[in-house]
């Protein structure tokens, strides 16, 4: 009998004991974890390759977090074959035994929770609170999905007639290719890996090239937790060479992808083509980003509105698909809200996230830095720069939290996903107009409405077309089991990660009817 699910609590770093524990974890990671080399893992065997992926600290380009062997198409083929072979036994493993692997993995991660979070500080430049939340979410995914599988194994009730027994059960699907992002490098990577595993599928994991070390560490945890060889296969590599090969392979049954719209739609298109020897249609589970809006009504709490915009825009330097990169504010409170957001933003510290007092660290790499700085130049032409706007990539990839005012709703800064610390303000004259602007992008992931008007809340519930809608809070920070996460429109397939329907996406429903 398992205990009821409850999300992993966040660490309060205002408590000195917790601060010291995390400082010790950072020291451990610096002295013992950094600079290691990690092989491919295929069918339980280790493969070292000549070509490597080098993971660096985005806050300090001179610091190597680790090197990871880089897979070729030959390795990808071996991984698919190993996963297909392991599927023939893993699919029949008792669901409670599969769930037990996740519970053991959770215990191992919890024992080194601060060390894993400290690794995220190094590999992704996450501030302490963001890193701690990422690790907590990874724990939550394992805890939640393990419990969900135990329930799902019972099947669903259907009607039976006299002399007839009918069952509706779920069966595993097959080989799952998992392509996670670099931003939630532990949480999403872990969640999208263990969901197919616990449902009886096998996995080929191709981690993000910008953050492969945490994935290598997690594969070690799964192996130490009793996961049989071949159930998860670790093949970091380029998207063009390895990613496409895995997506196209006739033995691939499911592709789970989190990342950009461009790559996601390409995967969706490639997966739809039936390859020679393929005996099934591939399932694609995709989350492809957002252009998310915080709507501020005229009847609102000004401080709450400002804090919500700030948190939504600049948490983890805006490198979240859920980030509130658009603030659509009623003209009656526009100036006051904008002024307060600027004040909050300019009071926060930006720098290397090794220190507890740093609110915002670097962006992930040079390509991201260049892209964001290009968008800042576009913003200077489209709107009014009121805070930030400078970048410094001399040591790490640092960009000031940047605020633009007076944007046209159809401006590029209001339409295109930037994935950086940039928020654009647009003024509206009514709640009708606010909803119209909120819905005017091709995305539909998250949104928030700050208002005291109950009628407007009820309207937004119906008319604000996003997968995750929040009222009187920020539009980021979904909790597994509490806020199932996934978007509408071009934000993806609305596969709600951390929700009651998610595991079923990895399985096939089977009807069994027996006469007696």
UniProtKB/Swiss-Prot annotation:
Active-site residues, Swiss-Prot/TrEMBL: 287, 321
Record's catalysed reaction(s): L-glutamate 5-semialdehyde + NAD(+) + H2O = L-glutamate + NADH + 2 H(+)
EC numbers on record: 1.2.1.88
Entries under InterPro entries matching the protein: Ald_DH/histidinol_DH, Ald_DH_C, Ald_DH_CS_CYS, Ald_DH_CS_GLU, Ald_DH_N, Aldehyde_DH_dom, Proline_metab_enzyme, RocA
NAD is among the record's keywords: yes
Gene3D superfamilies: Aldehyde Dehydrogenase, Chain A, domain 1, Aldehyde Dehydrogenase, Chain A, domain 2
GO cellular component terms, A-Z: cytoplasmic side of plasma membrane
Annotated GO MF terms: 1-pyrroline-5-carboxylate dehydrogenase activity
Pfam short name (any one): Aldedh
UniProt keyword terms in alphabetical order: NAD, Oxidoreductase
One biological process term in Gene Ontology: proline catabolic process to glutamate
Pathway(s) the chain acts in: Amino-acid degradation; L-proline degradation into L-glutamate; L-glutamate from L-proline: step 2/2
Family, similarity comment: Belongs to the aldehyde dehydrogenase family. RocA subfamily.
Record-given protein name: 1-pyrroline-5-carboxylate dehydrogenase
Organism listed in the record: Bacillus licheniformis (strain ATCC 14580 / DSM 13 / JCM 2505 / CCUG 7422 / NBRC 12200 / NCIMB 9375 / NCTC 10341 / NRRL NRS-1264 / Gibson 46)
């Amino acid at each position: 009998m398992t205990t009821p699910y409850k999300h992993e609590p966040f660490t309060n770093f205002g408590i000195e004991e917790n601060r010291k524990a995390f400082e010790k974890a950072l020291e451990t990671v610096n002295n013992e974890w950094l600079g290691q080399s990690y092989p491919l893992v295929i069918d339980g065997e280790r493969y070292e390759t000549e070509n490597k992926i080098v993971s660096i600290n985005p806050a300090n380009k001179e610091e190597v977090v680790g090197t990871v062997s880089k897979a070729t198409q030959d390795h990808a083929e071996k991984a698919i074959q190993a996963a297909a072979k392991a599927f023939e036994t893993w699919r029949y493993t008792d669901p409670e035994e599969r769930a037990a692997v996740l519970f053991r993995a959770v215990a191992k991660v919890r024992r080194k929770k601060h060390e894993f979070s400290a690794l995220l500080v190094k590999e992704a430049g996450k501030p302490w609170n963001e890193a701690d939340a990422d690790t907590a979410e990874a724990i939550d995914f394992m805890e939640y999905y393990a419990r969900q599988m135990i329930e799902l194994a019972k099947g669903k009730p259907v009607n039976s007639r006299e002399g007839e027994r009918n069952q509706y059960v779920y069966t595993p699907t097959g080989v799952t290719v998992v392509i996670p992002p670099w931003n939630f490098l532990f949480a999403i990577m872990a969640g999208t890996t263990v969901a197919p595993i616990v449902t009886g599928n096998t996995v080929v994991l191709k981690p993000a090239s910008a953050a492969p070390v945490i994935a290598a560490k997690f594969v070690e945890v799964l192996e130490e937790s009793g996961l049989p060889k071949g159930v998860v296969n670790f093949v970091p590599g380029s998207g063009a060479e390895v990613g496409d090969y895995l997506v196209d392979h006739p033995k691939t049954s499911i592709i789970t992808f989190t990342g950009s719209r461009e790559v996601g739609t390409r995967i969706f298109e490639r997966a739809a083509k039936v390859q020679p020897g393929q005996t099934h249609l591939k399932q694609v589970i995709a989350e492809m980003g957002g252009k998310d809006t915080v709507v501020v009504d005229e009847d609102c709490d000004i401080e709450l509105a400002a804090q919500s915009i700030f948190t939504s825009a600049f948490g983890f330097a805006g490198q979240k698909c859920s980030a509130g990169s658009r603030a659509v504010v009623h003209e009656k409170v526009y100036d006051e809200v904008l002024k307060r957001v600027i004040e909050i933003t300019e009071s926060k510290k930006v720098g290397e996230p090794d220190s507890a007092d740093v609110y915002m660290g670097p962006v992930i790499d040079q390509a991201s830095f260049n892209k964001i700085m290009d968008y800042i130049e576009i913003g200077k032409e489209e709107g009014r720069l009121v805070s930030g706007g400078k970048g410094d990539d001399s040591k790490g990839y640092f960009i000031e939290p940047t605020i633009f005012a007076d944007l046209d709703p159809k401006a590029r800064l209001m339409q295109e996903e930037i994935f950086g610390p940039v928020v654009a303000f647009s003024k509206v004259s009514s709640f009708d107009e606010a909803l119209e602007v909120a819905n005017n992008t091709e995305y539909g992931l998250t949104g928030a409405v700050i208002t005291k008007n109950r009628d407007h809340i009820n309207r937004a519930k119906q008319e604000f077309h996003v997968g995750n809608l929040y009222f009187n809070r920020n539009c980021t920070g979904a909790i597994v089991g509490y806020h199932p996460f996934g978007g509408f429109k071009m934000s993806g397939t609305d596969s709600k990660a951390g929700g009651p329907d998610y595991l079923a996406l990895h399985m096939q429903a089977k009807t069994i009817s027996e006469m007696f």
